[in-house]
């Protein structure tokens, strides 16, 4: 008798091996119809999977968290099926699941067009409506190579040939189309109801620029139409908020070919930068950090000692001078250890906290560069804490408190915490990593935090806590980190004198709150759609005169406000006031101060807040009070 145990603890007995679909049918016809797959003893499988021993089983339906992966994987195959139907000469390559959807790469003699996407989506809908069964077969590797060669699918044959000899491979067929895949897949194409093809792109075969350029089709798939509609709406909002477009519209920064991945900051953009930097400098001071500055270029020998040369060389810019090899720093930590090592330290001095607005350079692939979000040159609010093992928890707890206060001030209230654990490529032995990971777990527990663990995602020198911010349209951004490092201080000879006069190696905590200032400013721009809070706005108010008669008073108002430390401009052009109002509204200026004869005579200003909100006529002192309040509270005015 074969026993299948269900998630609620109930058991089903069967006299012979049984398919997942049959177990679902034994529970109820509704569940059988809804089944998309199963989880047998922790492994995701098709509904056709045969259970031949006592097992635990969970049926995957559209209510299961695993459902989207199966549906998206199956939709990628549906796309490939449609391509082969409409373009029989196209060759299929790979089609993985990615965040929010999938892509599939094809080789074809001409570029696909937007019209082709429309036709392909229509064909996919037609194939889905046929509700053709999706069947799995297993084939020896060599037989599978010949199978795909006969079909003219040379890329698939090459992929399978790279699998070790003697291994079997699984194939999935729907209608006339067969593809290589580990699975699992939906039981039939009729389960695929909500999908959309999104865009076209190029991609090299196997990611190697020496190989053929393939055509990549991106798509998205969802279990419910309302989920897809929400996702598409979010994409529309993302387009409106694109910091690259807003950076140009608001005259904040630009990029050019002569400096790929590097930013030309304009006065208004640099004003935002300065506000963020000065704010973070105050955080350094409040949290007991000493600000330092380390060199940009360091000898190769130091990078070899730190482990960067072995583990990070491909991302470093290198140069030579007088027969010595150097590298532009990709990280600030080795420089801070040198500052620490310049003197002898006692245990009484620990924790010792250094902070730097450290400019780093990383040789990112050109295809990965993306505005302010992915650059080759960036500045971090980078701090390093030298402490004892006993001080780790209290330092991490203090950092956690500070990081949340900072995010609150910048307008982010939803913060998720993740713990990134040891990667495959790392320095230090497992005992050191065990100690480091447990130290961070203990600190999170002591802080009362909930967290998600990310195996393999840590830095090469230590595990890290990551802070992920949710923005105003629901996207998440990883910004702050704190990492425990038992390895680098020892590699670079850092020591302190312990209470018993012995020499010990300090623990080093790497921490950043906003991370890359460039990226964080890009996030701020998109979060606020360019409507920066008053305290960050490059121009906090503009004085607009209605006619030449009030020009002198407009200048007087501007000067009075500037003397009080506000960022104020005036526009005295001989243009219609409606034209000037519209122009500065497009610039997303927080306040417009309109002055004419009446305002000049009464020493007042007519105030319009962002979004066309009329705040009426008020004495200048009253406007100053409003401005000071908004700045101190780090708020509005919000666009209507």
UniProtKB/Swiss-Prot annotation:
Q: Report the co-factor binding details.
A: Binds 1 zinc ion per subunit.
Under the heading PROSITE patterns, the entry gives: AA_TRNA_LIGASE_II, TGS
Reaction catalyzed? tRNA(Thr) + L-threonine + ATP = L-threonyl-tRNA(Thr) + AMP + diphosphate + H(+)
Superkingdom as given in the UniProt entry = Bacteria
Q: Which InterPro entries match?
A: aa-tRNA-synt_IIb, aa-tRNA-synth_II, aa-tRNA-synth_II/BPL/LPL, Anticodon-bd, Anticodon-bd_dom_sf, Beta-grasp_dom_sf, TGS, TGS-like
EC identifiers of the protein: 6.1.1.3
Q: What is this protein called?
A: Threonine--tRNA ligase
Q: Where does Zn(2+) bind?
A: 333, 384, 510
Q: Where in the cell is it found?
A: Cytoplasm
Return the GO cellular component terms, semicolon-separated. Answer: cytosol
Tell me one Pfam family matched here: TGS
């Amino acid at each position: 008798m074969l026993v299948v145990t269900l998630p609620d603890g109930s058991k089903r007995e069967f006299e012979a091996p049984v398919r997942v679909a049959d177990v679902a049918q034994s529970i109820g016809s509704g569940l059988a119809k809804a089944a998309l797959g199963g989880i047998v003893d922790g492994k995701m499988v098709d509904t056709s999977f045969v259970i031949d021993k006592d097992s635990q089983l969970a049926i995957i339906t559209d209510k299961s968290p695993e459902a989207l992966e199966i549906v998206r994987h199956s939709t990628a195959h549906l796309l490939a099926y449609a391509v082969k139907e409409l373009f029989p000469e196209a060759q299929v390559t790979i089609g993985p699941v990615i965040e929010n959807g999938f892509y599939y790469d094809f080789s074809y003699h001409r570029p696909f067009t937007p019209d082709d996407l429309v036709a392909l989506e229509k064909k996919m809908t037609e194939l889905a409506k046929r509700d053709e069964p999706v069947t799995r077969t297993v084939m020896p590797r060599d037989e599978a190579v010949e199978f795909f060669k006969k079909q003219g699918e040379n890329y698939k044959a090459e992929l399978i040939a790279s699998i070790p000899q003697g291994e079997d491979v699984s194939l999935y067929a729907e209608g006339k189309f067969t593809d290589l895949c580990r699975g699992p897949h939906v039981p039939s194409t009729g389960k695929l109801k909500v999908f959309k093809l999104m865009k076209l792109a190029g991609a090299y075969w196997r990611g190697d620029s020496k190989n053929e350029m393939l055509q990549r089709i991106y798509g998205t798939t969802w279990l419910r139409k309302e989920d897809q509609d929400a996702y598409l709406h979010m994409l529309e909002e993302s387009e409106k908020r694109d910091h690259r477009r807003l950076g140009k519209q608001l005259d904040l920064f630009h990029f050019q070919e002569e400096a790929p991945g590097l930013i030309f900051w304009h006065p208004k953009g640099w004003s935002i930068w300065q506000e963020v930097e000065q704010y973070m400098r105050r955080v350094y001071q409040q949290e007991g950090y000493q600000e330092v500055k380390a060199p940009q270029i360091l000898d190769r020998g130091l990078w070899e000692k730190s482990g960067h040369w072995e583990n990070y060389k491909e991302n470093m810019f290198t140069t030579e001078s007088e027969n010595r090899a150097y590298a532009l720093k990709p990280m600030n930590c080795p420089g801070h250890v040198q500052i620490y090592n310049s003197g002898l330290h006692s245990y009484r001095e620990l924790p010792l906290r250094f902070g730097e607005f450290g400019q780093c350079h990383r040789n990112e692939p050109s295809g990965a560069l993306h505005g302010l979000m992915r650059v080759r040159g960036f500045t971090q609010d980078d701090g390093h804490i030298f402490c004892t093992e006993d001080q780790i928890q209290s330092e991490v707890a203090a950092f956690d408190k500070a990081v949340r206060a900072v995010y609150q001030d910048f307008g982010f209230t939803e913060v998720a915490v993740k713990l990134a654990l040891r990667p495959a490529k790392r320095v230090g032995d497992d005992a050191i990593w065990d100690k480091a990971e447990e130290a961070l777990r203990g600190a999170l527990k002591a802080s009362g935090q909930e967290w998600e663990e990310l195996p393999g995602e840590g830095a090469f020198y230590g595990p890290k806590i990551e802070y992920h911010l949710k923005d105003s349209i629901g996207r998440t951004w990883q910004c702050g980190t704190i990492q425990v490092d038992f390895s680098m201080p020892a590699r670079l000879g850092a020591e302190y004198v312990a209470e018993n006069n012995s020499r010990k190696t300090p623990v080093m905590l790497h921490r950043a709150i906003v991370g890359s200032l460039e990226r964080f400013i890009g996030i701020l721009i998109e979060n606020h759609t360019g409507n920066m809070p008053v305290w960050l706005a490059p121009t906090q108010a503009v004085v607009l005169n209605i006619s030449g008669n009030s020009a002198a008073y407009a200048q007087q108002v501007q000067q009075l406000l500037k003397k009080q430390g506000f960022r104020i401009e005036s526009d005295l052009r001989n243009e219609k006031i409606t034209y000037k109002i519209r122009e500065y509204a497009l610039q997303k200026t927080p306040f417009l101060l309109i002055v004419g004869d009446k305002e000049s005579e009464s020493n007042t200003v007519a105030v319009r807040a962002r979004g066309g909100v009329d705040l009426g006529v008020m004495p200048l002192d009253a406007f100053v009070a409003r401005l000071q309040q908004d700045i101190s509270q780090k708020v509005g005015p919000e666009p209507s």
